[in-house]
């Protein structure tokens, strides 16, 4: 049976349907409230509270597939993001896959700044720099990355990007 780890599982958007399809799913969620909601939705998911940067509950090479769909755009520093990738790599079996979600800078600029006509406002407010990179403030909920940021993280973690599936 395929073993899946959902890191930053939230309320179970992915882990619950995957468990219902018959996969052996383990979920890890930082926020206690979200974890409670996930547990209410399904008793088929093994759900734990924990941090994406420290997957100490799990052994090396334990999962066939590791999903990291929430943490990477909530983690602020490159060090935290690298720690999360390294931990995902550690718990994923050789030949397994790690799927990671990021919020892409360019997509956000195109949809918010250009399409919704907020370029001038974004620059004046300091949300965009002169190279149209989204700047982050300490209390921002999300962090934005460019493709070169992902490539640098992957290189540091000795991971290879197979493909980008969608922009979000």
Feature-to-residue mapping (PLM):
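A short SAM/SAH-binding and catalytic strip from SAM-dependent methyltransferases
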Residues: 65-79
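Conserved S-adenosyl-L-methionine
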Residues: 159-168
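Class I SAM-dependent methyltransferase SAM/SAH-binding core
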Residues: 13-54
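Acceptor-substrate binding/catalytic loop of class I
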Residues: 75, 134-149
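A short glycine-rich, Lys/Arg-flanked "PGG" loop and its adjoining helix->strand segment in the class I
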Residues: 82-94
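A short acidic, Gly/Pro-enriched loop at the edge of an enzyme's catalytic core
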Residues: 56-66
């Amino acid at each position: 049976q395929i073993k899946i780890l959902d890191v930053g599982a939230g309320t179970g958007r992915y882990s619950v349907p995957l468990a219902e399809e018959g996969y052996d799913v383990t979920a890890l969620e930082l926020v206690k409230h979200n974890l409670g909601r996930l547990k209410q939705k399904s008793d088929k998911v093994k759900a734990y509270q924990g941090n994406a940067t420290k997957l100490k509950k799990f052994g090396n090479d334990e999962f066939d597939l590791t999903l990291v769909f929430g943490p990477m755009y909530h983690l602020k520093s490159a060090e935290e993001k690298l720690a999360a990738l390294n931990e995902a790599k550690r718990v994923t079996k050789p030949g397994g896959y790690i799927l990671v979600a990021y919020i892409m800078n360019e997509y956000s600029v195109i949809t918010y700044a250009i399409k919704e006509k907020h370029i001038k406002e974004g620059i004046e407010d300091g949300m965009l720099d002169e190279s149209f990179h989204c700047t982050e403030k300490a209390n921002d909920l999300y962090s934005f990355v460019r493709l070169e940021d992902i490539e640098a993280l992957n290189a540091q973690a000795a991971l290879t990007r197979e493909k980008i599936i969608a922009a979000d």
